[in-house]
């Protein structure tokens, strides 16, 4: 490049713009590459973080060797892979961290961002102009159940505050997802029994498998049901809803809370946790998703949730952030004795 060309780029501001675009695109490519390497099983073919090119071609039954080589070289250029001769090694910190089973929730969250949030952000303007909604049945329920576990440490605190350490206690969980919060409640109180409702059949099956794996099948039951049509003579001490209030239209939430009151014992309580309006970019992207998908609705406003609980007849309504400086909230209320 000639010096005059470089000076012109600097003076025009385009050099700075190009630098910003390159930085942004590199992180976009990094997220896409890592997510694909994990979700498409490429990293599964590495042994102790290493794999030869021939081994990958064989395991992946690839005929387009040039295409696979080009894809792997993107990983090398990003620093996620290292190539020594004809062998590739997993090098990137994020790749290594997300391969750890204990970080599965973060692995799922990355895939959700790359494969789903991206689509909502890019396609929402077109869908809105066409007066169309994203279909609900394309939502990856099992993936969302996994990624939602990123919030576990904060929601665990809310569960612990609502569940006593001992004594007979009956829990109804609406939208139980993976069942992890039922497990938490059962672990906290060995006398607790729970019913988990799950709207999506595949997610309900996953929760049942988890309950059995945790040895809780005699204490927890998972039902595939829409809570709005749920009927039971059983009364509960606590009803919980974690990260799913936006699955119910705003205008239906007050009636939902009234419906849930029917299943509570005198003095029973409700615990609701949710991301709410006013968060960072990740929460803003989620709000696009729930605001443009059929059957869902925008993330809740904390004040509005409190008002709806009170209008439904709950007392002692309290709300508070679970995470400082982020819009993840817990709402707690009770019915009269």
Regions found by a protein language model. Give the residues of each.
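Conserved SAM/SAH-binding beta-strand->alpha-helix loop
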Residues: 200
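Conserved Class I S-adenosyl-L-methionine-dependent methyltransferase catalytic core
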Residues: 24, 36, 74-169
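Short, glycine-/aromatic-enriched active-site segment of Class I SAM-dependent methyltransferases
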Residues: 277-295
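Conserved SAM-binding loop of SAM-dependent methyltransferases across substrates and taxa
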Residues: 178-190
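A short acidic, Gly/Pro-enriched loop at the edge of an enzyme's catalytic core
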Residues: 228-239
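A short glycine-rich, Lys/Arg-flanked "PGG" loop and its adjoining helix->strand segment in the class I
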Residues: 254-266
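Conserved beta-strand signature within the Rossmann-like core of class I S-adenosyl-L-methionine
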Residues: 267-274
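Short alpha-helix
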Residues: 297-313
């Amino acid at each position: 490049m000639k010096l005059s060309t470089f000076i012109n780029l600097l003076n025009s501001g385009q050099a700075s713009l190009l630098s910003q675009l390159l930085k942004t695109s590199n992180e976009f490519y990094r997220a896409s590459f890592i997510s694909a390497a994990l979700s498409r099983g490429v990293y599964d073919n590495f042994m102790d973080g290493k794999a030869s090119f021939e081994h990958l071609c064989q395991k992946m039954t690839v005929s387009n060797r040039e295409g696979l080589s080009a894809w792997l070289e993107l990983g090398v250029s990003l620093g996620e892979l290292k190539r020594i001769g004809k062998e590739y090694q997993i090098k990137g910190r994020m790749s290594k961290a997300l391969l750890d089973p204990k970080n599965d929730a973060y692995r799922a969250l990355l895939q959700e961002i790359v494969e789903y949030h991206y689509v909502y952000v890019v396609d929402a303007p077109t869908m809105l102009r066409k007066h169309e909604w994203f279909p609900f049945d394309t939502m990856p329920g099992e993936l969302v159940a996994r990624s939602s576990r990123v919030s576990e440490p904060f929601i665990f605190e809310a569960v612990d505050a609502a569940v006593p350490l001992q004594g007979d206690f009956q829990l109804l969980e609406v939208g139980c997802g993976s069942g992890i919060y039922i497990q938490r409640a059962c672990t906290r109180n060995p006398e607790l029994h729970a019913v988990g409702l799950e709207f999506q059949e595949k997610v309900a099956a996953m929760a049942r498998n988890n309950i059995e794996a945790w040895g809780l099948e005699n204490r927890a039951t998972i039902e595939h049901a829409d809570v709005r049509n749920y009927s039971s003579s059983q009364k509960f001490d606590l009803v919980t809803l974690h990260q799913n209030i936006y699955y119910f239209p705003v205008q239906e939430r007050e009636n939902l809370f009234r419906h849930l009151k029917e299943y509570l014992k005198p003095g029973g309580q409700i615990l609701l946790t949710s991301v709410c309006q006013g968060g960072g970019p990740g929460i803003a992207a989620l709000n696009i998703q729930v605001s443009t998908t059929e059957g869902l609705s925008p993330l809740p406003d904390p004040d509005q949730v409190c008002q709806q609980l009170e209008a439904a007849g709950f007392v002692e309504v309290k709300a508070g952030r679970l995470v400082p400086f982020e819009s993840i909230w817990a709402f707690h209320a009770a019915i009269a004795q």
